[in-house]
């Protein structure tokens, strides 16, 4: 045994110790010094070993490590003990630790192997590793090899714990004791002596089932006398010592599971071998470990949100069903829903659990909630269930919801523990954990909902996520009845329309009451279930009939006058008016004039375009109550306008489309431009403004403008204005006209108008509005004669749900980005590289802000080296995120949030135009001294702020300093930064990190005393020298030479002789102060701000420097 186990790596062996100890509920703390001494006495080790153990305090981990033969021999050699006794000690420790395990949970590095016995091995110390643990494999070995192990019975189900059982005690009926009859039981991976599928535990009896030859050498009485309470502590709790007890193991051919003794209750008498067992994964790793006190199951209706149900006192399936319904607040009888077994993420819901199967599944429950039930309306009740009862599924309410005239459905009882908000996602899915949308004044009385004036209105109610199993079944190849359900007409419609219905087999159209002034008849059902929506129903109003020759163009005005131009879908009939005092009436139409509809429509539009709009009255929101409409117009209405009308409308409104090359110069020349408030940006093809946008887009397909740099040449990052102006070039993978966001400026604030769907606008228009806002801020700053532009902080994303909008996502008319729910962003072109990842341009499509995202890819390869690399990367990113979350300073790159996925980690930062100081030096050359003072002062402000927050940057250099077109310098890249409680005290835990040429001497060689934040001051001196000289410090030395001069000779970077005569004495004094070798004397960042070199000329203007001209030239 010593030879075999000694050949194994110590790491692998220690892992098996951990597994064995874990299975037996044995803590390393049990191996106190007293227990170790008791162990030595038990195995009759001499007094010398006891003295050495007491002197060296060998206990706990130190004692367990001696199970490694090489470590035991090394310990014996060090303490002048015999090598043979060390080998014996190692063998005894391994027996004690490994032998008691009768089952072992498979880890990621091991799998179930077959229990083997090698008859040719004659050594007493040879063990064979199996899925059942570590057992002696020598059938002829004497009791010497296991004399300290008490007799016990064998684990049958794989979940019972017990002590080691020698192979001589496992005898098969009618077989020789030197032979092993191995039978793979159905549902059990453990090979034991068995016959006809029934496992029989062979018990250690003093006068039975023990090899006579072995007994002659070592009496059993002597074996029992050596049993002590010391070894009994390693038995698994709940271990049964009943003699000759035969147990039947229920099994399944497809997926075996084993019951723990502490979990097994009285099974039904009809449960024979081969009966049904729950098909739940990962169950076998949770059973047979400890005796539990309570039993829990999880219940869900969407495989994402689970409810914990305590079934400790449940005795039968009926009680279980009632308890699940009560826990999920389902006010229905137990006959109205079915239960299925499920897992997180979903499963195939094919097998309904009847009472017998449910009772069996109940027996498999544990304190970990391994058993999970999926609750689904029963097939018999589903078709006959009314809409209100069906909508009660998935909601936490003590009663069903009743829809009234003003709402679709509303909450009757709020969540008491966890608040949940309705989220409008890209595929129009409501991810609400429980409470329904509150509409028409039914506001929830909940402190978490304060600040929301009303809930958003939806055109359709989506299908519950719990019913989205059709695609999963198709992929897995469903057959029979399930395949028939998948391929029926109802299922086939889901391929064309993602909008789903709450009632699967009955369509209920939306009916809304009209006001008294409407000519439409009042529907008798308009007052009942008015807002129950259907699966294939697209909400809209019917198009108006064609006008007659005598019909007037005047009708009820619903347009809104706003100060800025908004773009939305136009209508063939544009509402007009002459004065605010004029009264409007509905246009009357003659249905007999259908033959002249096209000509009349053309004339109406032409005449309309000449009517002024200054005197149009403002929108009276009270008029909307009797004139319901939807944001999406029917497709057939667009065909009523001839194509030539586009040119007529455009020409009448005097839009200069021929000069649309420059988007900024091409503004509407007439203040009479109407605002198409009733339309939608998803289809703006009929509006004059859309024609202008289409033409400008067509012109942009020509060679790119000189104002935008090549996307592959990022020497200078373009300004935000240039990015907004040519947003298609920097986000080429997206169709910006189809990505929609909610227009916050038009959100309905009145609770009585929540049935009106919010207006939408495209990301292209959102970007344009953001650009106009920036120009307005700049204009106001110049008008107020402000020296610097007002700083505008980016939107913080910490704590919010952040989702990347993939370019290959199918974007439909319902793909809307909600402003109040999640932050969605689009990834643009690559703009740089960081310490661990790449930096991309991005846009927050909720707000239109341009941001930068640093993405770090997590290695997915499974091996030890990559696992450590993965851990190092994740730890580094987590440390960076924790440090920078609260930083907010003008001279620090602002961190906005982060998003973690299985493949990468994204950190969101503010977008800084321009470029790094290092790149500017390589392209431009040395900076003027006044410019160096200007930049250095800003860096010192940023460093002083970082040090006040307890952060040491440790990688300050020119490449990590960004400067924008306004001359603002920002410190970036906190990948190796470190937090310290006292930044100016030496921290011995800090390792050598940073770039060699910018390192301080104490970083390289500090005699284990560590260093402080003053290393950043040294690095600042290197940056100042770099800006003045135009090249890096130690420019004439290699990295090894620089390390030797810094660490051994304690020298500072040399100042070029030609530079001394070109710069002022203050600059030389500043460099000498930064390059003070003694860190205790070196000044702090706060002190350096008072240095004479930090005083800038009051007349200095960054835009008058050659660097600014170079940046603008590179940009263009």
Swiss-Prot record:
A family per Pfam: Pkinase
Record keywords, A-Z: ATP-binding, Kinase, Nucleotide-binding, Serine/threonine-protein kinase, Transferase
Binding site for ATP: 831-839, 854
Domain of life: Eukaryota
Residue ranges with Polar residues bias: 634-647
Keyword Nucleotide-binding: yes
UniProt-annotated catalytic positions: 955 (proton acceptor)
EC identifiers of the protein: 2.7.11.25
Catalytic class of the enzyme: transferase
Biased composition (Low complexity): 515-531, 588-601
Stretches the record annotates as Disordered: 510-601, 618-647
Swiss-Prot/TrEMBL GO biological process terms: cell integrity MAPK cascade; fungal-type cell wall organization or biogenesis
Protein kinase domain span: 825-1094
PROSITE patterns assigned: PROTEIN_KINASE_ATP, PROTEIN_KINASE_DOM, PROTEIN_KINASE_ST
Keyword Zinc included in the entry's annotation: no
InterPro entries per the UniProt record, alphabetical: Kinase-like_dom_sf, MAP_kinase_kinase_kinase, Prot_kinase_dom, Protein_kinase_ATP_BS, Ser/Thr_kinase_AS
GO molecular function, one term: protein serine kinase activity
CDD domains with a match to the protein in the record: STKc_Bck1_like
Bias kind Basic residues: ranges: 553-569
Catalytic reactions of this protein: L-seryl-[protein] + ATP = O-phospho-L-seryl-[protein] + ADP + H(+); L-threonyl-[protein] + ATP = O-phospho-L-threonyl-[protein] + ADP + H(+)
Protein family per UniProt: Belongs to the protein kinase superfamily. STE Ser/Thr protein kinase family. MAP kinase kinase kinase subfamily.
Function: May regulate cell morphology, cell wall integrity, salt resistance, cell cycle reentry from stationary-phase arrest, and filamentous growth in response to stress. Activates the MAP kinase kinase skh1/pek1 by phosphorylation.
Entries under PANTHER family matching the protein: MAP KINASE KINASE KINASE SSK2-RELATED-RELATED (PTHR48016), SERINE_THREONINE-PROTEIN KINASE BCK1_SLK1_SSP31 (PTHR48016:SF48)
Protein name: MAP kinase kinase kinase mkh1
Gene name of the encoded protein: mkh1
């Amino acid at each position: 045994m010593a030879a075999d186990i000694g050949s194994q790596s110590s790491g692998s062996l220690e892992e098996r110790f951990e597994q064995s100890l874990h299975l037996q509920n044995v803590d390393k703390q049990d191996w106190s010094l007293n227990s170790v001494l008791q162990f030595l006495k038990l195995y009759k080790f001499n007094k010398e070993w006891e003295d050495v153990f007491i002197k060296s305090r060998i206990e706990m981990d130190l004692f367990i490590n001696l199970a490694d033969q090489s470590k035991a021999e090394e310990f014996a050699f060090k303490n002048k003990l015999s090598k043979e006794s060390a080998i014996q000690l190692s063998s005894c420790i391994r027996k004690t630790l490994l032998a008691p395990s009768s089952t072992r949970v498979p880890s990621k590095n091991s799998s179930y192997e077959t229990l083997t016995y090698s008859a040719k091995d004659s050594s007493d110390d040879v063990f064979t590793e199996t899925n059942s643990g570590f057992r002696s494999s020598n059938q002829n070995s004497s009791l010497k090899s296991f004399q300290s192990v008490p007799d016990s019975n064998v684990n049958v189900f794989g979940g019972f714990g017990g002590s080691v059982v020698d192979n001589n005690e496992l005898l098969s009926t009618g077989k020789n004791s030197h032979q092993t009859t191995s039978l793979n039981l159905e549902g059990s991976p453990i090979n034991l002596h068995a016959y006809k599928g029934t496992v029989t535990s062979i018990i250690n009896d003093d006068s039975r089932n023990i090899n006579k030859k072995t007994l002659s050498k070592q009496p059993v009485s002597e074996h029992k006398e050596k049993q002590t309470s010391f070894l009994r502590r390693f038995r698994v709790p709940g271990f049964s010592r009943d003699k000759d007890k035969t147990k039947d193991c229920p099994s399944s051919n497809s997926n075996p599971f084993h019951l723990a003794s502490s979990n097994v209750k009285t099974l039904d008498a009809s449960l024979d071998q081969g009966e049904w067992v729950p098909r739940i994964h990962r169950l076998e790793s949770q059973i047979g470990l400890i005796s539990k006190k309570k039993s829990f199951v999880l219940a869900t209706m969407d495989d994402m949100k689970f409810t914990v149900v305590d079934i400790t006192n449940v005795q039968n399936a009926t009680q279980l069903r009632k308890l699940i319904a009560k826990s999920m607040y389902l006010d229905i009888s137990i006959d109205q829903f079915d239960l299925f077994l499920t897992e997180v993420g979903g499963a195939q819901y094919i097998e309904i659990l009847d009472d017998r199967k449910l009772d069996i599944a109940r027996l498999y429950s544990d304190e970990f909630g391994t058993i999970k039930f999926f609750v689904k309306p029963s097939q018999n009740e589903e078709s006959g269930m009314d809409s209100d009862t069906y909508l009660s599924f998935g909601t936490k309410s003590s009663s069903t919801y009743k829809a009234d005239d003003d709402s679709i459905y509303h909450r009757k009882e709020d969540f008491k523990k966890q608040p949940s908000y309705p989220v409008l996602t890209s595929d129009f899915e409501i991810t609400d954990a429980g409470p329904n949308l509150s509409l028409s004044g039914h506001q929830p009385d909940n402190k978490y909902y304060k600040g929301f004036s009303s809930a958003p209105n939806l055109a359709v109610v989506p299908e519950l996520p719990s019913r989205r199993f059709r695609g999963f079944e198709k992929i897995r190849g469903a057959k029979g009845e399930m395949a028939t359900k998948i391929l029926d007409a109802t299922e086939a419609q889901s391929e064309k329309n993602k909008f789903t219905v709450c009632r699967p087999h009955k369509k209920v159209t939306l009916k809304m009451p009209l006001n008294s002034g409407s000519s439409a008849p009042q529907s008798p059902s308009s007052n009942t279930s008015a807002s129950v929506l259907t699966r294939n129903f697209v909400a809209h109003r019917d198009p108006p009939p064609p006008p007659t020759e005598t019909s007037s163009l005047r009708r009820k005005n619903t347009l809104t006058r706003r100060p800025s131009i908004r773009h939305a879908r136009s209508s063939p009939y544009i509402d007009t008016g002459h004065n605010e005092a004029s009264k409007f009436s509905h246009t009357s139409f003659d249905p007999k004039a259908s033959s002249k509809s096209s000509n009349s429509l053309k004339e109406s539009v032409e005449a309309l375009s000449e009517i002024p709009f200054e005197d149009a009255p403002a929108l009276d929101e009270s008029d909307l109550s009797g004139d319901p409409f939807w944001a999406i117009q029917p497709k057939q209405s667009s065909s009523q306008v001839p194509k030539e009308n586009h040119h007529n409308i455009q020409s009448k409104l005097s839009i200069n489309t021929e000069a649309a090359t420059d988007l900024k110069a091409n503004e509407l020349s007439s203040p009479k431009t109407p605002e198409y408030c009733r339309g939608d940006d998803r289809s703006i093809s009929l509006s004059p403004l859309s024609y202008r946008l289409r033409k400008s887009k067509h012109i942009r397909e020509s060679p790119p403008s000189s104002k935008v740099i090549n996307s592959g040449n990022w020497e200078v990052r373009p300004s935000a204005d240039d990015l907004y102006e040519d947003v298609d070039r920097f986000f080429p993978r997206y169709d910006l006209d189809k990505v929609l966001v909610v227009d916050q400026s038009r959100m309905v604030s009145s609770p009585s108008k929540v049935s009106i769907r919010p207006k939408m606008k495209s990301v292209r228009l959102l970007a344009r509005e953001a650009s106009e806002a920036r120009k307005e801020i700049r204009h106001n700053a110049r008008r107020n004669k402000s020296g610097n532009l007002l700083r505008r902080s980016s939107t913080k994303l910490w704590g919010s749900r952040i989702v990347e909008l993939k370019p290959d996502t199918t974007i439909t008319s319902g793909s809307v980005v909600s402003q109040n729910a999640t932050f969605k962003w689009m990834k643009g072109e690559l703009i740089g590289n960081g310490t661990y990842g790449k930096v991309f341009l991005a846009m927050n499509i909720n707000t239109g802000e341009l941001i930068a995202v640093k993405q770090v890819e997590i290695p997915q390869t499974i091996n030890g080296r990559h696992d450590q690399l993965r851990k190092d990367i994740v730890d580094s990113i987590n440390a960076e995120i924790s440090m920078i979350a609260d930083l907010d300073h003008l001279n620090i790159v602002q961190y906005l949030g982060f998003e973690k996925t299985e493949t990468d980690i994204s950190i969101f930062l503010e977008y800084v135009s321009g470029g790094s100081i290092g790149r500017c030096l390589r392209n431009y050359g040395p900076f003027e001294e006044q410019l160096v003072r200007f930049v250095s002062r800003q860096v010192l402000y940023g460093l002083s702020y970082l040090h006040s927050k307890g952060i040491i940057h440790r990688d300050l250099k020119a490449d990590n300093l960004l400067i924008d077109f306004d001359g603002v310098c920002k410190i970036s890249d906190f990948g190796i930064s470190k937090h310290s409680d006292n930044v100016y005290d030496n921290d011995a835990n800090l390792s050598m990190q940073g770039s060699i040429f910018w390192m301080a001497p104490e970083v390289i060689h500090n005699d284990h005393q560590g260093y402080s934040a003053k290393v950043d001051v040294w690095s600042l001196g290197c940056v100042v020298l770099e800006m003045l000289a135009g090249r890096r410090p130690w420019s004439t030395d290699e990295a090894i030479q620089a390390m030797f001069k810094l660490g051994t000779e304690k020298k500072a970077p040399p100042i070029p002789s030609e530079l001394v005569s070109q710069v002022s004495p203050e600059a030389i004094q500043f460099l000498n102060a930064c390059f003070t070798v003694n860190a205790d004397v070196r000044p702090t960042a706060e002190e350096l701000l008072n240095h004479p070199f930090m005083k800038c000329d009051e007349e200095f203007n960054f835009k008058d420097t050659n660097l600014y001209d170079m940046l603008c030239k590179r940009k263009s």
